[in-house]
Each structure stands twice: as structure tokens, then as C-alpha cells.
Amino acid sequence: MNHPERKQARRFDMPGRCQEFTDLVYSGVHEDPAGLWEKVKQTQNKFDPPSPEYNVYFGEMHGHSILSDGISADQDVYYQNIRDLAKLDFAALTDHDHGGVGKPELWVGDPSKWNFIQETAKKYYEPGKFTTLLAYERDSYPYYNNMILYFNNHDADMVRGVRDGEITAEELRALLKRDDVVVIPHDTYSLSSGADFEHMDLDLITPLIEMISRADPAEYMGHPAFARDTCCEGGYWLDALKRGAKMGCIAGSDDHDGMNGRVHEAWGYPGKYPGITGVWAKENTVEGIFEAIKSKRTFCFMGGRMTIDFRINGHYMGEEITLGEEEHANIFIDVKADTKIKRIALVKNGRERVCLMGPTHQMVFDYFNEQETDFFYLRVETEDGRYGWCSPIWVTRK
């Protein structure tokens, strides 16, 4: 892209306007039109980054067994269903710390329910084949009533504060600084169990959000796939991002009936589709999956399978990058799904800036920053009404 006045004329661009492309188009009569078109395509694809240095793995990050308020699956059946029926690569069992209303808490007894959860995670862990993450869901009023803790090992202790079911700002800050745990809230938009990203201190906002379970996207208020009975302003992903929070996204089904990772046809749209997380990781191990989540190299979607490869100047989703004065953002988009993709939106600072209705592979050039640090992510919509999202990339220019 060498035209000296391109940045005077436009904000967004694409490889199809490069000089080599134009020269081929204006090359006159050609003996092999098909071969010419192939060269035209090659001139655009040469701007693409190399193949990803990571592998894609899919997982279930939120579900319950009879150890708390699950109604059908014990911890063995839980992992078996996810591994053998949903055919996912990794899973976290996230039973409630209160153990289910009227039942013993997870830490009660010797051995305790938590001991069973630890041992079951170890039992089903097969490095390279199926990864189990030790986790649980913790009530944490008033900041996040439903908050899930994911650990980087199978021997971690539960985190209890001054008062069970609650958390103080001091306790939350200490938790967010730990390297061995990732904290991700659930139902942040809910009136009863939500969060207020527009009001709380910025350093209390978690590094990721659970975007969707079965229905109810937490992207923004008024999303067309939202079906819950209550919602509350301030608890959405975009509320946090617009404040400057560096927040990525994951998903989980929050199933209580053993249908984790699978379509629940009887529930109808949108609730029949489970939230599924995708990660870009070096390997399918506890260390590999945890590192990918901690780094926000994550995307998520409603049911089935979807792969989102989103990079800016070679950097992956979840990264914060700085460009030089003469550099511009080379935005790479490549999305694949198990059904036809209806629309891909490039969202910049909360607004759709480029939409693809048909193409699923595209390089976009963005010449200008709008604020000190811009955030970019993709929103994907399929023909059957499912949605997908990826963690943002944050871009600062010198």
C-alpha cells in the first residue's frame, strides 16, 4: 500500500487496492484469464500473517454436578459426558462453594467435597488428550455475586474470606494479583447477581468475562440473543471495555443436567445452544490451557464449532500492542464454523466499523487511532442465529 495520499483519503483499506493488484487488473489482454485471477488473489494473500503458532482447543468452562445443585450428573459422569459425548478438549467442573442450598459447603467434611473435586480432576486428566481445570463458583457479593475461580494445578485450596458468600475490595485485589488463579464472573448483567463496571474501581474488574452460557450474551444491553428475566445497566462487556478495562471473553454452558457442550433441542432458541470456549494454546495440558486463558488468547461461541483467528500486526487476541508513528494496524480476520456464516463485524471502540457479509477471510488496514488506546474484536453471526466473539486486541500508537 504505497499511494502517498491514501491516508488523506480514507481510514480503512484492504489489499485489493495495492499497486501490484491494480497493475494486474490494468494489464490488458491476457492469454490465461484464470491464471491472472489466481495472481490477483495471491497479491492479496501475501499480506496475511503466517499460520498460527498455536493450536485450537475447545472446552466447557462452567457446569455443575450433584456435589452442589446439579440434578443428574455426578463428577465422573460430568467429565465423561464432556469428553465422550460433547467431544471437547478440556473442561472445568465449577460447583458452587455453598454446595447447594441446604447442603454442606464444599469445604465441609474429611474428606470434603473439594477433595473429591480435586481427585476427580486428576483422575480424568490425560495430558495431550483431555485437560481438566480445577475450579469452583464462589458467591462474592457485592462486586460479583457469581465468580468462578480457575487454578493452574489440581491441588489448590479454596479461597475463603472474612465472610463466606461475600468479598471485600482488599480480598478481590489480592485474588486478581495471583498468578496461579484466573477469576471470571458469570451473569454480570443480572440484577440479583451482577456487577457494575461503570461504578466499581477499575482495578477490581476481572481480566475476562463469561460472555454467554445458554443464551444471554453479556456483550451489550439489548443483544438479540438475550432471553433472561432481568438485566441491569453497567454489567456488560462493553461497559467495562469502554472504561478502559483489559477484559477478554470465554463461555460456558452453566448446565446443571449433564448436557454440557451439547445442543439442548427441547429448550428452543437461544437457550438450546451451550456456550463453548476456544483457546489458542501450545498444548492441551493444564499448563497450556491455563496460560492461554490467563493471556486472554480466547474466543467463544454458541454451540457447535467455530474457530476465530484474529490478529493485528501478527499479534494475537488478548494482546496489548504499541505501533510506531508510521505504522498502521494490519487486521487479519479468518473465521470458520460448522454452518454458514451470515456476518462478521469488526468492532472498534464499541462500534462496528467493517462488516463482512459473505467473506470469512479478510485483511483490513486501519490507518488511524481514535483514542489513546483503541480496542478491536470480532462479533460473528451465523445463519442459524448463533453468535461468536473473540477477546480484544488493544492498540496504542506512539
Predicted regions and their residues:
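Extended, charged catalytic domains and RNA/DNA-binding interfaces, predominantly
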Residues: 1-398
